[in-house]
Amino acid sequence: NIKEAVSEKVGNVSEINISLTNALIATKLNAEIVMISTRENGFPTRLYPVMSDFNYIISKVKINDKTYFLDATDKLVSFGILPFRCLNSYGRAIDFQNPSDWIDIIPENPSKNDLLGILKLQENGIITGKIKKLTTLYEAKERREEVTPLSNDAIISKFENNFKNIKVISYKNENLKDIDKPLIEYFEISIENGDINGMHYLNPFFENSKMSNPFKQEDRLYPVDFGYTQSNTILFSLELPPNFKVVSAPESQSLSLEQNAGNFTVKSAIESFKVTVKSTFTINKSLFYNNEYASLKELYKQTIAIYNTP
């Protein structure tokens, strides 16, 4: 009951998103509802679709020749971004004046999870510096869900528990509640690095050094559906005292899937008193078919091996 949902300000998914569509139409925008099947519900049949294939309704609006998909049920989803459960490749657009039609539902832009670390090794062996973490779109939504309920002290404690010998001196964030902007977090840190036979060791890939391969099976019968494309860049810079030198750094190299469907690159630069390492891991399409599974799994395997190189 749409009227009741509007009056009571409470409703199910269909009532809320139909109300949203009606509101958009009332403002003279080109809007219509789209029936979809959520990820857990499976794909609807394209050839002979039936109502029982669908279990969810979203809204579609066209503004200045650009199409946006909307869902008003999740307060942490920004304009034009659907909840992850709705990313199931396609849906059925319903125009009550014209025949219904299939429409692709694939996010345009990659979700980013980037990290910048500017560090300095002190004469006493302690490393100090700052880390900036930036997330966008679905990566930002996931991070907001993680940190919104927590105090700054709890966020610091969780960060320190994930990394051996790291102490967080201060923490702050930007745009936590402004969901249309990237979420930016700042950590000021110190690292009790420890001296092992006169050597200091530091993994420049930070949280990615704990990454594990999500693909365990030898073969796969069904597609791998990430839902969205993604990009992860880490830029690491370490300044050294004059009496220190870099013995080794990650080797510059590149890995890539066919048609650039996914890739990993790492580049290292060593100057007189400074080492810089930049790595980028990208998944450039959201859906991989079963015949692409082996190469996708191998990309993850080789990337993780580099992340974990001593």
Where are these regions (language model features)?
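A sensor for short, sequence-defined functional sites
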Residues: N1-P310
